[in-house]
Regions:
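N-terminal low-complexity, intrinsically disordered segments
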Residues: 1-106
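Generic structural hydrophobic/aromatic packing signal, biased to beta-strands
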Residues: 61, 116-118, 139
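Intrinsically disordered, low-complexity regions enriched in serine/threonine
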Residues: 1-44, 106, 121-333
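Beta-rich nucleic-acid/ligand-interaction surfaces
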Residues: 102-123
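Short, solvent-exposed coil/turn segments at beta-strand boundaries
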Residues: 65-66, 111, 143-145
């Protein structure tokens, strides 16, 4: 369901699947469909037995343009985040990216949810070598209390309630979030810093990954690299059958994994990333929850980070290859 009601609108640079997009050539972060209205909190009151109006402490949001209700009653501790503050966060992120542009903006669910999708380089994805990386920075906020304010990085542009929910639930792509409680101004400032860190890290990743593409490595050395890496904590122990099977899996991904040709250190890193993202837990990742936890929070994540350090340090990579070569030579005796 798109859930674009009469009070909602979705503006974009191209027509979305629902056919309701107001297609434009450019979207200005300072003047757009979300600047035409905002939210205002009004107190919920009652009249006591003496005929006096009393406040309950609860409130309700209404649109500043039509005074119609948005969402449901709010507790005293709930802090609404206005469209103005939401767009300030988007604007701050875009100011760091000269090529960034808004691809989609709007609201759904009777203005209960608002969203902005920004392409970082003026397109939905970018390539480093033959590999394609996701390039949308999605911002979402709920006036109806159905979600926190969130930011993620995916290749899915938010154009409706379905894509809003999809991006909200893609935990592996989450950049940052803030709940509607406490010091909202401080949380938004912190979130802005988180986005800055993300953008800086992404730019650094592109440069380093491009360097890895230029560094060639043979199939044999890649096998030694994987072996030496897996045995980095126990170099004096012999290679187990499980370790050798893991090396075989990594070597296969090095040569035939998505985007890989078995030619360079980028292929080696992609092989390790693919393995620890999808296949590293018991049963080759068949238990998706266990695999996800390992990949994003546990041993899988640590191994991906450690291998990134190894391949970006030439001396460390050579030492790892030497260790792997020695261990493999003992197996082949």
């Amino acid at each position: 369901m798109h859930n674009i009601t009469e009070r909602d609108a979705q503006v974009g640079l191209s027509q979305a699947w629902h056919g309701l997009t107001d297609v434009v050539d450019e979207i200005d972060v300072k003047e757009n469909v979300l600047t035409k209205w905002d939210v205002e909190r009004k107190p919920l009151t009652y009249v006591d037995v003496d005929g006096n109006e009393q406040e309950t402490g609860y409130g309700i949001l209404v649109g500043t343009d039509d005074d119609q209700i948005i969402g449901k009653p709010m507790t005293p501790s709930y802090k609404a985040i206005s469209n103005e503050k939401f767009l300030d966060l988007v604007s701050d992120a875009m100011s760091k990216l000269p090529k960034a542009k808004i691809e989609s903006i709007g609201s759904v669910c009777n203005r209960g949810k608002v969203f902005v999708t920004v392409s970082l380089d003026g397109k939905s994805n970018y390539k480093v070598g033959d590999r394609e990386f996701k390039d949308y920075l999605n911002f979402g906020n709920a006036h109806d209390q159905s979600s926190k304010l969130w930011i993620n990085n995916t290749n899915t542009c938010t154009v409706c309630d379905n894509t809003f929910t999809y991006n909200l639930n893609d935990k592996s792509a989450m950049v940052g979030s803030a709940v509607h409680r406490g010091d909202i101004e401080l949380k938004l400032a912190d979130l802005s810093n988180v986005v800055d860190d993300f953008l800086g890290t992404q730019a650094e990743f592109r440069q380093k990954f491009n360097n890895l593409l230029k560094r060639k490595i043979t199939d044999k050395k890649a096998q030694s690299l994987f072996t030496g890496f897996l045995m980095r904590n126990n170099p004096k122990e012999g290679l187990s059958t499980r370790c050798l099977n893991t090396v075989d899996s990594l070597n296969s991904l090095f040569k035939r994994g998505a985007g890989n040709r078995g030619e360079n250190y980028a292929d080696a890193f992609s092989a390790v990333t693919d393995y620890y993202t999808h296949n590293s837990t018991r049963g080759k990742g068949k238990n998706r929850l266990n695999q996800y936890v390992s990949s994003e929070f546990g041993l899988g994540r640590m191994n991906k980070q450690s291998f990134w350090t190894v391949v970006n340090n030439k001396d460390l990579a050579e030492r790892t290859i030497e260790r792997g070569t020695k261990l493999l030579s003992l197996v082949n005796q």
